[in-house]
């Protein structure tokens, strides 16, 4: 007897799937964010997904492997979004570090987490 698969997903459920879904089904929808520099940045889900894939490739070139930890030290904006999705798409563990912390605190957090990349 064959197992019934019903409508079960045939792919792993990953955070990066959210951005891929948006790029496929709402490719031209704009993502709008205000940059630290003060201006407004606009691009599409298609562009964001492409840049997240490039971030994933950069992590691979840096020697990151599935399960490695990477830290972001960034303000909340489009660049942070790309790093977040690029890391999760590479099966990396991504955590944020508050840029307002003192350098000693940032170093302690990154060392304690055993980050591969900051």
What residue ranges belong to the model's regions?
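Conserved AMP-binding/adenylate-forming core of the ANL superfamily
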Residues: 31-77, 81-85, 102-107, 111
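A short N-terminal helical cap/helix-turn-helix that marks the beginning
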Residues: 10-32, 50
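Structural core segment of the AMP-binding/adenylate-forming
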Residues: 18, 61-62, 89-118
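Active-site-adjacent beta-strand anchor residues
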Residues: 12, 73, 118
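Charged/polar positions on well-ordered alpha helices
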Residues: 24-25, 50, 54-57, 89, ...
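A detector for short, charged/polar N-terminal pre-domain segments
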Residues: 2-9
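Residue-level signal for pocket-adjacent positions within structured domains
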Residues: 4, 26-27, 38, 92, ...
């Amino acid at each position: 007897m064959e197992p019934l698969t019903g409508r079960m997903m045939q792919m792993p459920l990953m955070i990066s799937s959210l951005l891929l879904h948006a790029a496929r089904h709402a490719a031209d929808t704009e993502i709008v964010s205000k940059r630290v520099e003060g201006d407004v940045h606009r691009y599409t889900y298609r562009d964001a997904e492409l840049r997240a894939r490039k971030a994933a490739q950069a992590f691979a070139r840096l020697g990151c492997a599935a399960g490695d930890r990477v830290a972001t030290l960034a303000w909340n904006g489009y660049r942070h979004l790309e790093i977040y999705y690029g890391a999760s798409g590479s099966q990396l563990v991504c955590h944020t570090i508050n840029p307002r912390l003192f350098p000693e605190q940032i170093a302690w957090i990154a060392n304690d987490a055993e980050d591969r990349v900051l």
